[in-house]
């Protein structure tokens, strides 16, 4: 007589979770304000009200504030009576959308075109000297979009190899985020595993990004101490702190999904 050992298989669908309408409205409102503010800066630069340095610096502050929008969702929705896992899912989705939008809006276009666009740009003065070209035509404002971060960090315009290599992860994040939404639609119990696995990448990349410049004595930082803090701290802490937070939450949600989907096989 033989006895079979019970096993557990994950055959059931995970709980259905979607981006709630209230959280979506908060995200869309904040994103619309950020987009409008950025376009306003572009117009003010184009017509000569703002110079390249000031318009670029302000755009960096605006995007840094907008990347914190999940905190606004948490603050406004934390007592709304929503289930904990659904609430965490909303916060995670907001952060993932912010991250993927920055990938699409700047990082991937920069990775593809920067080596063609920026030629013989070694100093901030070299970059500012392109102002007349940018103001020649609205079509030339692509240069402003790609060049804004150069006001804070010249590695974005002088073909720095480390910076270029790190931005390759933008493609990985884009693909993994889209796949997460695919798995979520299928109610796969492994959907949050992608977040758990991927949360270490932005942390490692950001540490390399920031400290490689520290060890080089800030050679690519053309501004004052506040510009350096904006480049290496304020625009970057989100990619260290937030992945830690959401990696932990995703691990909790993954365990909840696995418990919900588990079937005991005798």
Predicted regions mapped to residue ranges:
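Aromatic-anchored segments of alpha-helical transmembrane domains
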Residues: 34-42, 100-105, 200-210
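Transmembrane alpha-helix/helix-exit interface in multi-pass inner-membrane proteins
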Residues: 100-144
């Amino acid at each position: 007589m033989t006895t079979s050992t019970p096993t557990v298989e994950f055959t059931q669908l995970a709980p259905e979770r979607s981006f709630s309408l209230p959280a979506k409205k908060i995200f869309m409102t904040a994103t619309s304000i950020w987009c409008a503010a950025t376009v306003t800066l572009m117009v003010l630069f184009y017509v000569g009200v703002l110079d390249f340095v000031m318009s670029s610096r302000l755009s960096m502050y605006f995007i840094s504030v907008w990347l914190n929008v999940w905190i606004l969702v948490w603050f406004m929705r934390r007592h709304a009576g929503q289930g904990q896992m659904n609430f965490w899912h909303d916060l995670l989705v907001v952060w993932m959308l912010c991250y993927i939008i920055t990938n699409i809006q700047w990082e991937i276009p920069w990775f593809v075109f920067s080596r063609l666009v920026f030629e013989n740009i070694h100093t901030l003065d070299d970059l500012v000297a392109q102002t007349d070209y940018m103001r020649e035509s609205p079509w030339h404002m692509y240069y402003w979009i790609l060049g804004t971060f150069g006001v804070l960090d010249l590695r974005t315009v002088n073909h720095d190899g480390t910076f270029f290599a790190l931005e390759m992860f933008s493609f990985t994040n884009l693909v993994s985020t889209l796949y997460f939404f695919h798995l979520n639609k299928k109610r796969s119990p492994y959907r949050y595993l992608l977040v758990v696995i991927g949360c270490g990448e932005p942390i490692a990349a950001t540490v390399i990004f920031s400290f490689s410049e520290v060890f080089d004595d800030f050679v690519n930082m053309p501004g004052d101490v506040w510009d350096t803090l904006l480049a290496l701290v304020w625009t970057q802490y989100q990619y260290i702190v937030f992945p830690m937070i959401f990696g932990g939450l995703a691990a909790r949600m993954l365990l909840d999904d696995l418990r919900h989907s588990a079937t005991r096989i005798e």
